[in-house]
Amino acid sequence: MDIYEYVSNIISDVRINGIDALKRYSEAFDNYSGGFTVTDDEIEDADKSIKPGEKDAIKNIYERIYEYHKNQFEGQKINIKNGSIYGIIYRPIDRIGLYVPGKRALPSTLMMLGIPARIAGVKSIVLCTAPENGNVNKYTLYIARLLGIREIYKIGGVQAIAAMAYGISMKPVDKIFGPGNKYVNEAKRQVFGITGIDGLYGPSEICLIADDSANINYIKNDLLSQLEHGEASSAYLITNSLRIYNEVKLENVKKYYKETVEESIELANEIAPEHLELLVNDPLKYLNIIRNAGAVYMGEYGPVPAGDYFLGVNHVLPTGSSARFSSVLTVYDFMKRISVAMPSKYDFLSAVDSGLKLASIENMKMHYKSMEARI
């Protein structure tokens, strides 16, 4: 059975059999047979079990992420000309679902998803995450409390995506956000259209460009940091320094030698990596020739792991070369754009003849009559 059929069967089972199917999959995959809803007591217990220093670190990072994202939204775009009003208005999505992997808990991802959602004005947020030994990760619950998320379910995997999309054990959501394994990705792909999705996120990637000025230890550590995410992760080193090319000997790192930094960046544009890191002299002068990357980190104090945690930039990024057409997660992903038009009589009459001609070309008779009646 291929992955499409495997995932499709689970989604269909959950859609048709509801909570009974969720219980079966929770027992089979998570060894869990309890209730799905996380209680206030569980959230309180998680809060009490976290050390003050850990809370301070989480709050500091929370504030940095909030500060970075709060100015992304530039407001409504309304233009008034000749008595006409045209523009774009923005509205938050009514209800979203956040998926946070539970088996290898990454609570930082919840901040990267939840903070821009709150800034966007999303009122209703549901969180699904798989339990480990019957419990949700305590840091995930603490961050959910900071975000004001009270609707939390102990549901993971494909069944969580199906539950959020079809409203099993909860109200259905309008859009699902969050990374997962290949099965979760396939589930998101299959429910798209029933609900929205943020994207399809694969294994982590880093492409590091270094010139002869780069610190060898920084290069090695930064490349290995992304391989730490799992065996399917990718790491590329592109350098115009033969010394660095020869000294960096790491398993599972693909190395390329190019004559110049510009040529190195051109190769990186072809790779279109999730993370592009520049350890070169004067990196800013190369920024304008970078076309394809989920995120760019520059300078000796800008390693990718710092971006993963505390720089404030979002770490939910396009993978698998999808940076050719996709972007980093922002506040706008949690909003809808709605076009607005209120033409004046003068504006309408000055252009309606063109509209009538186009309606005739397309043989749209009622379109023609609708406009003609106003002349």
From Swiss-Prot:
It catalyses: L-histidinol + 2 NAD(+) + H2O = L-histidine + 2 NADH + 3 H(+). Pfam families: Histidinol_dh. Zn(2+) binds at Q226, H229, D308, H367. One of its GO terms (biological process) is L-histidine biosynthetic process. Substrate binds at S204, Q226, H229, H275, D308, E362, H367. GO terms for cellular component: cytoplasm. Its cofactor is Zn(2+). Pathway: Amino-acid biosynthesis; L-histidine biosynthesis; L-histidine from 5-phospho-alpha-D-ribose 1-diphosphate: step 9/9. NAD(+) binds at Y99, Q159, N181. Belongs to the histidinol dehydrogenase family. This is Histidinol dehydrogenase. It comes from Picrophilus torridus (strain ATCC 700027 / DSM 9790 / JCM 10055 / NBRC 100828 / KAW 2/3).
